[in-house]
Amino acid sequence: EADSTTTAVKETYGQMILTDEGIVANTYYYSTSCGVGTTASIWKTVEAQMLDYLKSSRLSQSPENPVQTDDGAVAAGSTEITAETTAEELSEEESFRDFITQTHAEDYEAQEGWYRWTYTVKEIDVDRILETLKNRYEANGKLILTLKDGDYSSQNIKNFSKVTDITIVKRGPGGVADELVIATDKGTYKIISEYNIRAVLCDGVTRVVRQDGSEVSMPSLLPSAFFVIEPSHDKKNMIGYNIIGGGFGHGVGMSQNGAKNMALQGLGAEQILNFFYEG
């Protein structure tokens, strides 16, 4: 138990975050952002439609637009905390690729290990992908679709022995991968939702390399769905893929490391909470 956390708890004891309707808000959080968050729409649930206070925002600071801290001082190199974001721009493939393949010194978490990472699969595990597709289909068949007669629909997954291509075809707010298409020798499948995408592309063996050089095992899920994928081919078939990504977690609500670094810049609890739960 640290003195700083004890103090924070005591100073905010009894405070609540309410929606515009006066209802206690669901304060979702995750570990680390890649410099931008997303919205609850990525979960494809009915409840997500009621969580409009969870915005997709850039977690960055700019010396051109400083913010005052609780004691009236200006936090060096910080930006006014507003609802302005680049989320719409980052939902475009080219813009997101430019964003995620670079680091941005103004981002609050630019020095965190999970801020950027790579995941290089040298030999694709087709059986693992097939098994995961079937498991995710059993969990929710509406989010694992099969291409038939030009349209995607929910159908049982057929066995296949080769993967010919993998492509992100849709991004959600902030650039998170929202729909992935996997082409095989027996059919083409669309995987919907960040969780399913993270599960399907994780082979359980390859280690994630964080930007600080440390390696981490990921047995069942990629760290996040904020990534771009670069397939490697041998003639007509995929033999592997390289992923360049950032962040750890789903990206909805408050980034814990983002909040930590905001506090280190001198921002107070109310300012930080108003940023992440602005709506």
Q: What is each of the regions a protein language model found here?
A:
Residues 1-279:
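Conserved, single-site charged/polar hotspot
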